Regions:
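Second RecA-like catalytic domain
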Residues: 1-257
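Charged, non-catalytic accessory extensions
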Residues: 177, 260-290
Length: 290
């Protein structure tokens, strides 16, 4: 069976099984492999943005907005039927075909894991709350920082750092901007870019804030980052890139040769040891292809 997702996302799914948050990782891998199912009708942009923000349940994460929306659609579909689920999708400006594609892809990946004897085949009647896979492999599915950490590994090296009220830096772009469709844009519109007026922190937060992003594209206003989530420094250091430099006298660790992390004296070696422990369960070290 051929994997329906790219290798990096396939390895992320294996990490989801290892760290026992399989269901959300299967869904997020499927979401990343398809176009967004959130609709943005020109005559209802404000409502579309409000829906997406509400779906995030207070988290600064477009990825969690999509994850929560899909899981609610799935729950309604299983409990009340397809018509009720589709009504939920229509009323919340979601594309039913996109949701169905995510369902199909996530089930295909689960079947692949079962076929490879990596997870047990659990009938739907024994699954908890309609989650995919063995309940034992989902005991951490509600641990949001863990889920975002594993997502960071699947999206690597898509990491950005806030450098000014509007601008961010990525590994290849000295200046980038959060796309207005993201819940982390802070109300920034494309016309605001390049404005001479002073801004509050319209981006993700103050300088130093880290984000992971799904895609980026070049528009007339610059480089825009789409589907973003704020992550913590340790998540960025351990999962969102490769540690390129070892501890030096300044106690600075650098990710992907561009993003430095400075630690108090004696802390950096402990972080390196922790990273090595995580690397020991990295699916990249396994002896089969994904």
């Amino acid at each position: 069976m051929v994997s329906p997702v790219p290798p990096a996302l396939g390895k992320m799914v294996l990490l989801g099984a290892i760290f026992k948050c399989l269901d959300p990782i299967l869904i997020l891998a499927s979401i990343e492999s398809t176009r967004t199912f959130f609709l943005k009708p020109p005559n209802a942009l404000e409502r579309a943005n409000e829906i997406r923000t509400n779906m995030a349940l207070g988290l600064p994460s477009d990825h969690y907005a999509a994850l929560n929306a899909y899981r609610e659609w799935r729950f309604i579909k299983q409990e009340q039927g397809r018509n009720a689920a589709n009504e939920y999708a229509f009323s919340n400006l979601m594309h039913v075909g996109g949701l169905a594609m995510i369902e199909k892809t996530s089930l295909q990946m689960l079947e692949m894991l079962v076929e490879w004897d990596l997870v047990r085949d659990i009938p739907p009647s024994l699954r908890y709350n309609h989650e995919l896979g063995d309940p034992e492999l989902n005991v951490n599915s509600d641990v949001q920082p863990l889920v975002l950490a594993l997502l960071s590994s699947g999206l690597a090296p898509n990491l950005a750092v806030q450098t000014s009220p509007i601008l961010l830096q990525t590994g290849s772009d000295p200046k980038a901007i959060i796309h207005p469709s993201s819940i982390n844009s802070g109300g920034l519109s494309i016309k605001d870019v390049g404005s001479s007026k002073k801004h509050r922190y319209l981006g993700a937060g103050p300088p130093g804030t880290l984000l992971l992003f799904s895609t980026k594209n070049s528009m007339s206003g610059g480089i825009f980052l789409r589907e973003t989530s704020i992550i913590g420094p340790l998540t960025g250091l351990m999962f969102a890139g490769k540690l390129k430099s070892v501890v030096d006298r300044s106690n600075v660790l650098t990710v992907d040769d561009w993003l430095p992390f400075k630690f108090e004296m004696g802390v950096a070696p402990q972080v390196c040891q922790l990273i090595r422990c995580v690397d020991n369960v990295n699916p990249s070290n396994l002896c089969f292809d994904i």
